[in-house]
């Protein structure tokens, strides 16, 4: 227990030292709150009793070597703010991300100090951006002026072409309306001669085809499928045409027989 207590007192005493307090006081002296150095044995609050620590000479024996106090330069190096090293960035630019858009140093973010620099970002003045914007605006303003002022003939041709196209469209629309009136069967002004028949046009057979079909009909009124295929191939007809012709020929023959039977007493 004695060794543990002595080690604990040793670490507390080493942490609460005069050197670190002087450094903290020098660092935050510029702030609004003034910090004063305090003795090592006095606590922060008045509620707690003061702790008394034994001196280093009495607490530790010879085997324990005293701790070397940290130099002010070493401690200051810990809290030293990071500064951008220009020679390193200029020497090796392979690791610089060129796809990031450089921000000017005047841009302030809520998490940064207004007077601090954005480290790792190349500062850029606003003069170059202003010149680029001004040149772009001049180009955009000059283009419509050039196009409008240098081609007066195009302005004159445009209304003429528009007038021609409008007249053509009106004439085409009138022509279409006349055609629709002529083709409309319900229109009262249309003559019955112009009405189109919905019946399909007949496909008359030639004299040679009708002669051969009559011979085949006199030989046999009903054709088999094979014979019908042969007749259609010889006469350059389809099987359906040959079939329909034979059906019509049989109906005609029945009518002729009825007429003969009615005429006979």
UniProtKB/Swiss-Prot annotation:
The record, for Gene3D superfamilies, names:
Homeodomain-like (1.10.10.60)
Localization annotation: Nucleus
> Which superkingdom does the taxonomy of this entry point to?
Eukaryota
User: Which InterPro entries does the UniProt entry name for this protein?
Assistant: Abd-B_homeobox_TF, HD, HD_metazoa, Homeobox_CS, Homeodomain-like_sf, Hox9_activation_N, HXA9/HXB9/HXC9
**GO molecular function terms noted in the UniProt entry:** DNA-binding transcription factor activity, RNA polymerase II-specific; RNA polymerase II cis-regulatory region sequence-specific DNA binding
Which PROSITE patterns does its entry note?
A: HOMEOBOX_1, HOMEOBOX_2
* SMART domains linked: HOX
Q: Which UniProt keywords apply?
A: Developmental protein, DNA-binding, Homeobox, Nucleus, Transcription, Transcription regulation
Q: Where are the transmembrane segments?
A: none
Name the Pfam families for this protein. Homeodomain, Hox9_act
Question: What residue ranges does this record give for the DNA-binding region?
Answer: 198-257
Taking the record's annotation, the residue ranges forming a coiled coil are none
Provide one Gene Ontology biological process annotation.
Answer: anterior/posterior pattern specification
Q: Where is this region: Disordered?
A: 163-188
Reported function:
Sequence-specific transcription factor which is part of a developmental regulatory system that provides cells with specific positional identities on the anterior-posterior axis.
The text of the family note is: Belongs to the Abd-B homeobox family.
Name this polypeptide is given? Homeobox protein Hox-D9
Q: Which organism is it from?
A: Heterodontus francisci
Give the source lineage, highest ranks first.
Answer: Eukaryota, Metazoa, Chordata, Craniata, Vertebrata
This protein's encoding gene:
HOXD9
